[in-house]
From Swiss-Prot:
Residues 601-775 form the PCI domain. One of its GO terms (cellular component) is eukaryotic 43S preinitiation complex. Residues 1-81, 814-862 are annotated as: Disordered. Residues 16-52 have a biased composition (Acidic residues). The keyword Protein biosynthesis applies. One of its GO terms (biological process) is formation of cytoplasmic translation initiation complex. Component of the eukaryotic translation initiation factor 3 (eIF-3) complex. GO terms for molecular function: RNA binding; translation initiation factor activity; translation initiation factor binding. This is Eukaryotic translation initiation factor 3 subunit C. It comes from Aspergillus clavatus (strain ATCC 1007 / CBS 513.65 / DSM 816 / NCTC 3887 / NRRL 1 / QM 1276 / 107). It is found in: Cytoplasm. Component of the eukaryotic translation initiation factor 3 (eIF-3) complex, which is involved in protein synthesis of a specialized repertoire of mRNAs and, together with other initiation factors, stimulates binding of mRNA and methionyl-tRNAi to the 40S ribosome. The eIF-3 complex specifically targets and initiates translation of a subset of mRNAs involved in cell proliferation. The gene is nip1.
Amino acid sequence: MSRFFYGGGSDSESSSSDEEELYERDEEEQSEEEESSEEEETSEEGSDDEEGGVTGAARFMRDMSESEESEDEEKTTVVKSAKDKRLEELESTMKLIDNAKKINDWAVISTEFDKLNRQIVKITQAGPTPRVYIKGVADLEDFVNETVSKQKSGDKKLNASNAKGFNAVKQRIKKNNKDYANLIDKYRKNKEAFLEGKDEAAAPAAAAPRVAKLERVEAPVDVPVADDEGFATVGRGGKTLQYTPESILKHLRVIVESRGKKNTDRLEQIRTMEKLLEVAQNPYQRIRVYLTLISTRFDLTSTSSANYMAPEMWKSAEQDFSSLLSVLENNRDYVVTEGVDEWEDDEKQPQVAAGETLYIPGSVVSYAERLDDELTRSLQHIDPHTAEYIERLSDEKQLYTSLVRAQAYVEGLSKAEKSDPKQDSVNRVVMRRLEHVYFKPSQVITILEDATWKALPSELDSGVTPRGKTGDVENLVLTLCNYLFQYSDGIIRARAMLCQIYFLALHDQYYRARDLMLMSHLTENISNFDVSTQILFNRTLVQIGLCAFRAGLIYEAQNTLSEVCGSGRQKELLAQGIILQRYSTVSPEQERLERQRQLPFHMHINLELLECIYLTSSMFLEVPLMAQTSSSPELKRRVISKTFRRMLDYNERQVFTGPAENTRDGVIMSAKFLAAGDWKKAAEMLNSIKIWELMPQPEKIKEMLSQQIQEEGLRTYLFTYAPFYDSVSVATLASMFELSEKKISAIISRMISHEELAAALDQVNGAIVFRKGVELSRLQSQIVTLADKSMALLEGNEKTLEQRTQGMANAFQRDQGAGARGGRGGGRGGHARGGARFPGQQGRRPGGQQFGGGALGGAIKA
C-alpha cells in the first residue's frame, strides 16, 4: 500500500515513473524466481531417475538419439526486460507506419503515430530517446512535406478519411518534432553515423531524478482564506494554469485536438476560452478564440441527451457570432474564409504588414446556417401551444439580423475576389434569408426588416439589398430571388423559384404565381430533387390552390389541391406531422430523418382549412355533375373527387343524420341541400362554418361562397328539370335564385356553348327554349345501356374464344363419321350404348345430352 498511496511532495509524472520502476523490479525478481524454480525441478527429476531407474512411460524413450537430447538442453527461456519489450513495440509500430506510407494510408499513419507518441513517453521516462524513433519522426515529417507539395501541384488528391488523417498528422508532427529538433538535425546531417551512435536524451533537463526511497510528506496546513481571491486554476501536475497572450494558441491547440474524444469536459473548455478572450490583445487572437468557442458550443448538442441546443447556449453562440463579425468588420486585413492553410507555429504570432491580408480558415456562413438549424430544431421539440414557444420564436429576430450581417460580410469578400466558393457562400446565406421571409405576410416582413437594420451598424450595408430599399417587401423578395436566379443553379435556384411562387400566391397574385410555376417546369422534374425541396413544392402547390379559391376560381382550386388533398396524406406531404401506422415498415433511422424534416408550427398551413376548401370546391363541381349524369344516363359517368363522393355516400347510408358537428359535416350537409334544390339552406349551412374566420377578409369569402352556391344551384336545377320543360322564363329563374337576368343569361349561354344543355336562348322574349328529341327518354336510355352491355359481353366472349382456339385447324367443325354422335344404334355386338368405341376412348362421355360442343366445346375441353 505504501508505494501506491503516499504523501505529497512530487507531481503525478514523477510518481508514475517511480511506480513503473517498481513494476520493472518486481517483474525481474519474478523472472529470476521462475528460473531458479525450474532449475530446482529439473535437478530433482534427474536425481529421482538416477536413484529409482527408468520406470513408467520413460522406458519407451530409451532409443532417443543424443543429438535430440543435446538440442533440448540447448533450449533456454529468454526473459526480456520491460525496456526491451517496449523497444520492440516501438519498432513494430514504426514498421506499421512505414508500410502505411507505402500505400499512402494516412488513417493508419495517424492512429499509429498517436500510439507511437504514447510509447515514447514511457521509454523516455526510463532512459534516453531511441535513435530509431528520431529516424521515424524525421522521415515522417519529410513524407508530410512531400505530400503537401504534391497536393499544391495537384498531382495527388486524398479521399475524406485519408484527408482527415493527413491533417491530423500534419498538425501534430511539427509540434512533436520541436522537442527533438537537435537530434533530428544530427540525423539529417549524417544518417548512418547517427544510427550507429549511442542513444542520447532529447533534453538533459527533462530527465526526472530517480527516487530510491519513498518518503511520506505531511500535507501543508490549510490556511483559511476570506474569499476566492487566493484561488487559482490548477492543471495537470498541480501546476497553476496561467492564461497569457503568448499561450493562447497553445491552449486552443489542446482544445482542438481533444474534439471528438470521450471524457472531454466541454463546459470547462468553454470557460477556458472565455478567459482567453479576456487576455487576448490583437484581432488575430480574438478571431481564433471566437472560431473555436462557437464550434465548442455547438459540440455540446452532440453529447447532450436532448437533440437540440439549450436556449441559453444558443444565445451565447449567437452573441459570440455577432462579436466575431464585429471584429472582422473592424479589421479588414483579417479574413475568415474556407480552403486556406492554418497557422502552424503556436510559439509565434503572425504579423500582418500594411496592405496585406491574413487568411484564417473558417466559415462564417456555416456558423450562420448552424444557428438557423439549431433554432429550427429547438422549435420542433417545444409544445407550440405554450408561452415557451412564443418566447423561443422571438429569437428569430436576432438570427435574421445575424444572417443579414453575414450576407454583407461575404458580399464584401466576393467583391474583393471573384471565385466559385465565395459566390457559393453568398448564395447560401441569401437562400437562408429568403427562407425566413417567403411565408410571412408583408406587415411582418416590414417590421422584421426595420428592426434588423436598426440593430446593425450604420456604416454596414448590403450590395444585393441596400439599406434604403427594404421598405418595399415585394421588391425585397423579388430582388433576393432574381439574385439567386442569376448566380446559382441546381437546388438553390429551384428553391428560390418555389419561394417566389409561394410569396406571390400568399399575396393573392394567382395568375403570376401560376404562370411562373408553369414556366419553371418544376412539375415535370420535381421527383429528381431532394425531399426538402419536394416538401416546399407541395407547400407551394397548396398555396396556389388556396389563392385560386380566394379569387373565386373554383375549378382551378379543386384541380390544384386534388393532388395533395386527394391522397389523404396532407400531413405527411406538407411535413406537418408523421402518420404512425400499426404495421409500418419504416426503420427507426428513416423515422428519425422524417422527424428532422418536420416544419416548425408557425410555418404550418392549417390542414382543417385546407380540407374545408378542397371539399367545398369539390362540392361546387360534383353536385351539378351528379345531377347532369342522373338526368342523362347516356353520358359517361365520371368522378371529379373520389374523396367527396366517398364522404357523401357514407353520409347518405346513415339511418339517422344529426346536425353538423365539424367542418366536414357542414360541407356534406350543404351539398345535400344544394342537390335538393334548396340553395338558401345550403348557403346558410356553408357560411355557418367557423373556419372561414381564419382567412383574410372572411366577409368577402362568405359573399363569394353565397354567389357560387346560387350559380351552381341554377345549373343543378336546369340539369335536373330540363327534360320536363318546353321553355322557362329568365325572369322566373332570376327570382328563384336571386340573380340578375344578365347573370342568368350568361350562365345559360355558357352551358349551351359547352353542349351541357340542349336549349336555345330567346333574347326577344327573355326565355329559354329546350329542344326535344335530342335527349333520349328513360326507356330509350335503358335500351341503349342494355345494348352496350350486350356488345361488351359479345366482345369478351370472342376474345376468350380466340385465345382458346389458337393453333386448332378444325376448331369450327363438328365431329363427322360413324359414332361421332353416338345414339342408340350400338346393339350387343360389343358396341355399348352411345356409339362405337374407338382406340383410346375410355367409354361413354359423361352427361345426358352428349353434346360435343363444336368450337366452343372444344375450347372449353382444351
